[in-house]
Regions:
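Helical "lid/coupling" subdomains associated with nucleotide-phosphate turnover
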Residues: 1-5, 13-19, 25-209
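Single conserved hydrophobic/aromatic residue that forms the stacking wall/gate
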Residues: 210-219
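Short acidic, Gly/Ser-rich segments with clustered Asp/Glu that frequently serve as metal-coordination loops
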Residues: 10
Length: 220
């Protein structure tokens, strides 16, 4: 029984595996067209490392769904980005050391991260550190809500599952998410940032043939 948590730059993607069987759906839309083919049931929300923090009209701190993407990326990447992101908040809080990316070959600029969050902190009348804490908490809350949608709302108790956290930012938020959901066990694989790529290369290939019945539109 596993709940997967994949946090990349743009989104946090969660899914559920119960009794060894991954959750699937049979109705999706692609570019406005309905697809009646089985697919993994993945719930994606805008709470990735590059998700931008902002303040709404009620002066409440929000995160996502807009993202800084890979280019220019978070402010701390020093590639032209200036808006505060979840990654910048993690840098300010010391959760992402300067040598963390590409074994130190991709430097992290702490001052740019601090400057990006300071703009929000001034509007919120809070310290930069407390604003960074708020950004991380909001992002984690969005993820918790997404996991509850695929577990609690479908009759599953998250505390009976293991949280499998991966992606570049998955391990950074795994503990807060697990604590909020009552999950007792968190599994973080080696090299979590490239787990999806490794899975793509190492997974077995299978071929499934489906036909649809035009009379009742049922897949068999």
């Amino acid at each position: 029984n596993i709940i997967t948590l994949d946090i990349g730059g743009t989104s946090a993607d969660v899914s559920l595996i119960a009794n060894g069987e991954p959750s699937t759906v049979h109705a999706r839309h692609l570019a406005g067209f309905p697809l009646r083919l089985p697919a993994l049931d993945v719930n994606a929300v805008g709470a990735g490392g590059g998700s931008i923090a902002w303040i709404d009209k009620d002066a409440l701190l929000k995160v996502g769904p807009e993202s800084a993407g890979a280019i220019p990326g978070p402010a701390c990447y020093d590639k032209g980005g200036s808006e505060a992101t979840v990654t910048d908040a993690n840098v300010i809080l010391g959760r992402l050391p300067s040598e963390a990316l590409l074994d130190g070959r991709m430097p992290i600029n702490m001052e740019l991260a601090r400057t990006s969050i300071a703009h929000l902190a001034k509007k919120l009348k809070m310290s930069t550190e407390n604003t960074a804490i708020g950004i991380v908490q909001v992002a984690s809350a969005v993820i918790v809500k997404a996991i509850r949608a695929i577990s609690v709302e479908r009759g599953y108790d998250p505390s009976e599952f293991t949280l499998f956290a991966y992606g570049g930012a998955g391990p950074l938020h795994a503990m807060e998410v697990a604590k909020e959901l009552g999950i007792k066990k968190v599994f973080i694989p080696p090299n979590p940032g490239i787990l999806c790529a490794e899975g793509l290369l190492s997974s077995d290939l299978i071929c499934l043939l489906y036909t649809s019945d035009a009379a009742d539109d049922v897949i068999s």
